[in-house]
């Protein structure tokens, strides 16, 4: 498996199923600004709320071939083997498909993941052990705490500024290397001092 990150903003996403797994997947898709359609006879209370707010569309029925047309990303989150088989038989080769109940039946896996601002971390054991995946996620989320939210934004702003400086490539590299020292994550004062230092190069 090759790990990539998808930009789902404005992209069509079809979620087949309306239970716990579907709800969890949808929550992430909403954060990414996807255009979501849910197809399921019944859906969770959260999905009902999102529909009421106009955040997604719900078709309360069994999935049909017409629902799969012109969809960028399909997530099948149901334990109904007949539904899973139907979707597998009718998808197109160029569609991205995640089968929650059987990784091998789709061409996309959705790893455990979390974000701290511009920092995104994803963990997968390729289906070997969801429990180990969960443990590693908990360990990483503890090590990479909320301080990284502000820190990664600082790094991004500095990178933009440094690349605009009229200095040598080696000096730019030195500056970029300097700010990944943990002292900058832990001190807003150090961050301000560095930005003031950058101003002197202009």
From Swiss-Prot:
EC number: 1.3.1.76
Gene3D superfamilies referenced in this protein's UniProt entry, alphabetically: NAD(P)-binding Rossmann-like Domain, SirC, precorrin-2 dehydrogenase, C-terminal helical domain-like
Chain sites annotated for binding NAD(+): 20-21, 41-42
UniProt record, GO biological process: cobalamin biosynthetic process; siroheme biosynthetic process
A Pfam family recorded for this sequence: NAD_binding_7
Catalytic function, reaction form: precorrin-2 + NAD(+) = sirohydrochlorin + NADH + 2 H(+)
One Gene Ontology term of the molecular function aspect: ferrochelatase activity
Source domain of life: Bacteria
InterPro entries: Met8-like, NAD(P)-bd_dom_sf, SirC_C, Sirohaem_synthase_central, Sirohaem_synthase_N
Keyword NAD belongs to the record: yes
Pathway this chain belongs to: Cofactor biosynthesis; adenosylcobalamin biosynthesis; sirohydrochlorin from precorrin-2: step 1/1; Porphyrin-containing compound metabolism; siroheme biosynthesis; sirohydrochlorin from precorrin-2: step 1/1
Keyword Electron transport part of the UniProt annotation: no
Alphabetical UniProt keywords: Cobalamin biosynthesis, NAD, Oxidoreductase, Porphyrin biosynthesis
The protein's enzyme class: oxidoreductase
Subunit structure: Homodimer.
Protein's job: Catalyzes the dehydrogenation of precorrin-2 to form sirohydrochlorin which is used as a precursor in both siroheme biosynthesis and in the anaerobic branch of adenosylcobalamin biosynthesis. It is unable to oxidize precorrin-3.
NCBIfam families: cysG_Nterm (TIGR01470), PRK06718.1 (NF005222)
PANTHER family associated with the record: SIROHEME BIOSYNTHESIS PROTEIN MET8
Family the UniProt entry places it in: Belongs to the precorrin-2 dehydrogenase / sirohydrochlorin ferrochelatase family.
Stated name of the protein: Precorrin-2 dehydrogenase
